[in-house]
UniProtKB/Swiss-Prot annotation:
It comes from Escherichia coli (strain K12). Induction: Expressed at low levels in stationary phase (at protein level). It comes from the Bacteria. This is Protein YabR.
């Protein structure tokens, strides 16, 4: 479930 980490990072940048 490392893909969730990328989504969280993307949301933080937004």
């Amino acid at each position: 479930m490392k893909r969730n980490d990328k989504i969280l990072h993307y949301r933080g940048l937004n």
